[in-house]
Curated annotation (Swiss-Prot):
InterPro entries: aa-tRNA-synt_IIb, aa-tRNA-synth_II, aa-tRNA-synth_II/BPL/LPL, Ser-tRNA-ligase_type_1, Ser-tRNA-synth_1_N, SerRS_1_N_sf, SerRS_core, tRNA-bd_arm. GO terms for cellular component: cytoplasm. It is an enzyme of class 6 (ligase). It comes from Rhodospirillum centenum (strain ATCC 51521 / SW). Consists of two distinct domains, a catalytic core and a N-terminal extension that is involved in tRNA binding. This is Serine--tRNA ligase.
Length: 424
């Protein structure tokens, strides 16, 4: 959500930010609604105040033997008028909130201009892709090993689901355990086991609602399956005032994530790249405003460290204005090398959302001994997507005989196992 005061103070800057997102100006419509809403609010409050004052005077008039009938008539008229004024105030407030809620976050000043992913800017590349003649894709390797079952998953769940078996299932578990240990022990994150079902308010707070409802799964009870643990971890600050001295919060969780993949027809239809259900380790930070830029770099380093320890080549790019997510003001994508595809593919996205989500959630902080509060900043990142890490390990560590070497960093989590073989 945007800061209405900032829009009032500098509407031109707000429209410039929207233009960088490829959107038309909106400040005029916002300020018109804001003015009408404030006028309606003033009328409503003035009528309430006059009704209360007139009601007080009625008692005094009667006590003094004065004619109170004009005041009685006035109070009756005000009582009839007030509900309409209250409804007008509510309606205009709802319209203003809806308009603000539909607009994305404004990009940070140092975000590169661009229309789409082709305009993203690479900032570093780590590791050299291995030369693997005839490299196979993960689904070819997994099916040949007898440890990846797409047909069985399709029979019970439909497209974009996978069954992992045996040592591939163990490898998935090992990857998640390794990531959680790294983030909690070396980067100071607190592990959380959050709900997978949330209410409307939670997905509104992080920005998935109202615009992206079609990307989510909703239950018959009205709950939403989380598309990412960003939703639950960030909402731990929902409607809260946090001691400023306790910040930053650093939280991590490994959860299943659920996405409808609306609009992805024909994309990555084979394998595990794009699934309706997948495992991910999420990183979330809640910070003071002055901490968030440094925290963004720190979070991105934590995600990169996962790939460095696994010996996986990757590159990090900063997303351009046309490719950023709805709630982000700046985003780094980390893309891992997949030999089977001969391409770098996203495995982590680390975003600084500034105060955008916090305003939607009413998440604030207060320094010790002070009365005033300030809106916090929120950040989130994949630390990393477990399924895509599994894919990357399979493709980068594949052997000519179809087996897969286990990266050294994972062997303690695999009981010392060094290689995954057929039906292992």
């Amino acid at each position: 959500m945007h800061d209405l005061r900032a829009i009032r103070d500098n509407p031109e800057a707000f429209d410039t930010g929207l233009a960088r997102r490829g959107l038309p100006p909106a400040s005029a419509a916002i300020l018109d609604l804001d003015q009408r809403r404030r006028a309606a609010q003033t009328s409503f409050q003035e009528c309430q105040a006059r009704r209360n004052e007139a009601s007080r005077l009625i008692g005094a008039y009667k006590k003094d033997g004065k004619d109170a009938q004009p005041l009685l008539d006035e109070v009756a008229a005000l009582k009839e008028r007030i509900p309409a004024l209250e409804e007008e105030d509510r309606r205009l407030g709802a319209e203003l909130d809806a308009l603000l809620a539909a607009l994305p976050n404004l990009p940070a000043a140092d975000v590169p201009e661009g229309k789409d992913e082709h305009d993203n800017v690479e900032i570093r590349r780590v590791g050299t892709p291995r030369d693997i003649p005839g490299a196979k894709q993960h689904f070819e390797l997994g099916e040949a090993l007898g440890l990846m079952d797409f047909e069985g998953a399709a029979r019970m769940s439909g497209a974009r689901f996978t069954v992992l078996k045996g040592q591939l299932a163990r490898l998935e578990r090992a990857l998640g355990d390794f990531m959680l240990d790294l983030h909690t022990r070396e980067f100071g994150y607190t592990e959380v086991s959050p709900p997978l079902l949330v209410r409307d308010e939670a997905v509104f707070g992080t920005g998935q609602l109202p615009k992206f409802a079609d990307d989510l799964f909703r239950t018959t009870t009205g709950h939403w399956l989380i598309p990412t643990a960003e939703v639950t971890l960030t909402n731990l600050a929902n409607d809260s005032i946090i001691d400023a001295e306790a910040l930053p919060w650093r939280l991590t969780a490994r959860t299943p994530c659920f996405r409808s993949e609306a609009g992805s027809a024909g994309k990555d239809t084979r394998g595990m790249i794009r699934q309706h259900q997948f495992m991910k380790v999420e990183l979330v930070s809640i910070t003071l405003p002055e901490q968030s830029e440094a925290e963004h770099e720190r979070m991105t380093k934590a995600a990169e460290t996962v790939l460095e320890r696994l010996g996986l080549p990757f590159r990090t790019v900063v997303l351009c204005t046309g490719d950023m997510g709805f709630s982000a003001r700046k985003t780094y994508d980390i893309e891992v090398w997949l030999p089977g595809q001969g391409a770098y593919r996203e495995i982590s996205s680390c975003s600084n959302c500034g105060d955008f989500q916090a305003r939607r959630m009413k998440a604030r902080s207060r320094p010790k001994g002070e009365k005033g509060t300030q809106v916090v900043h929120t950040l989130n990142g994949s630390g990393v997507a477990v399924g895509r890490a599994l894919i990357a390990v399979m493709e980068n560590y594949q052997q000519p005989d179809g087996s897969i070497l286990v990266p050294e960093a994972l062997r303690p989590y695999m009981g010392g196992q060094e290689r995954i073989t057929a039906h292992g």
